[in-house]
């Protein structure tokens, strides 16, 4: 076990929202002049206040945003500029798109356990609405904006921490969810209106769902076998709020309704923010509490699946 615990957390959700039927999506509007970095800073300040800490008490800042604020430098450096300028706290990005937060928790738990860092700030911030294609109704009505920051630190309680983690990628799904433009394959300098869709989010939802449905049962079978646990040992599953198909996937995995959190209707898919935000909402509502064993899990573009079993 990697002995870590939550020291504090904070979230930020834009006040503005749009409705698609009974589905609510919080999105930044141009008039608000709120950047992805601004949202991250709001969440971080709340997390520091919640933990009763100052930024100087943080040993590492990790940004897990799926989409960067700018290509260079890393988003974590831009966040550092706003909250830690004048310090030499290391800052880095960890990116597996929607499951970036889980990947970061997994990686940083090893570094905390090894003594490299005592306390790590992991922040996810997404302005997904800016890159949506209005012609793709499914994804246009699904995604939302927001930010979440959680501070993890070394735990002296040997019963708390990461019990087991697993990540797998099936690259046959690499082009089922993508933004093709903006990198070296299709740089922004060759942008033209004829190919504008290359620079907007493109998701083939049915392909993703079918691939996930084929791969996830075996993924979870491995997770439980290697960890020595079963669903009866888990108090709550905190899944990525991928889509309204969440209930179908959970049912296929044999996870009963009372053992997972579903807030898709109220918040939609906030990309890398979804998992930590759902975790924080569960903590606030008392749906998970100290001593519980939980699973943070989700799928991401790639197709990647991620899971961390955590004793909180």
Regions found by a protein language model. Give the residues of each.
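Acidic, glycine-rich active-site loops and adjacent beta-strand->loop/helix elements
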Residues: 64-69, 96-99, 124-129, 168-170, ...
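A structural motif shared across PLP-dependent enzymes of the aminotransferase-like
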Residues: 14-20, 38, 67-78, 242-245
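Buried hydrophobic positions in well-ordered alpha/beta secondary-structure cores of metabolic enzymes
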Residues: 6-8, 47, 61, 104, ...
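Conserved catalytic cysteine-centered active-site region
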Residues: 27-35, 65-120, 251-279
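Phosphate/pyrophosphate-binding loops at sites that engage ATP/ADP/AMP, CoA/4′-phosphopantetheine
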Residues: 43-59, 218-235, 282, 286-287
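Catalytic phosphate/nucleotide-handling subdomain of diverse soluble enzymes
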Residues: 277-297, 303, 307-312
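Flexible, glycine-rich active-site loops centered on histidine and acidic residues
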Residues: 113-147
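Condensing-enzyme catalytic core mediating Claisen C-C bond formation in acyl metabolism
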Residues: 1-34, 136-210, 218, 312
């Amino acid at each position: 076990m990697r002995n870590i615990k939550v020291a504090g957390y904070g979230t930020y959700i834009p006040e503005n929202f749009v409705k698609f039927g009974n589905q609510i999506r919080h999105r930044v509007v141009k008039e608000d002049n709120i950047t992805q970095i601004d949202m991250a800073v709001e969440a971080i300040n709340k997390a520091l206040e919640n933990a009763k800490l100052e930024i100087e008490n943080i040993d590492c800042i990790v940004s897990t945003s799926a989409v960067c604020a700018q290509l260079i430098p890393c988003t974590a450096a831009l966040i550092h500029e706003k909250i830690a300028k004048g310090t030499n706290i290391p800052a880095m990005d960890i990116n597996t798109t929607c499951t970036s937060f889980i990947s970061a928790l997994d990686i940083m738990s090893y570094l905390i356990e090894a003594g490299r860092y005592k306390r790590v700030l992991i922040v996810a911030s997404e302005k997904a609405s800016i890159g949506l294609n209005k012609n793709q109704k499914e994804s246009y009505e699904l995604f939302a904006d927001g930010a979440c920051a959680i501070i993890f630190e070394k735990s002296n309680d040997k019963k708390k921490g990461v019990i087991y983690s697993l990540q797998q990628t099936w690259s046959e799904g690499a082009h089922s969810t993508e933004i093709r433009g903006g990198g070296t394959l299709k740089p922004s300098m060759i942008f033209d209106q004829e190919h504008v869709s290359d620079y907007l989010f493109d998701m083939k939802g049915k392909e993703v769902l079918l691939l996930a449905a084929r791969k996830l049962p075996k993924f979870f079978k491995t997770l439980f076998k290697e960890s020595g646990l079963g669903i009866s040992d888990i108090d709550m599953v905190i899944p990525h709020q991928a889509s309204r198909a969440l209930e179908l996937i959970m049912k296929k995995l044999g996870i009963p309704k009372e053992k997972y959190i579903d807030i898709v209707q109220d918040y939609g898919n906030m990309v890398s923010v979804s998992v930590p935000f759902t975790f924080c909402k569960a903590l606030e509502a008392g749906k998970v509490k100290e001593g519980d064993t939980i699973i943070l899990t989700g799928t991401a573009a790639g197709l990647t699946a991620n899971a961390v079993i955590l004793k909180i």
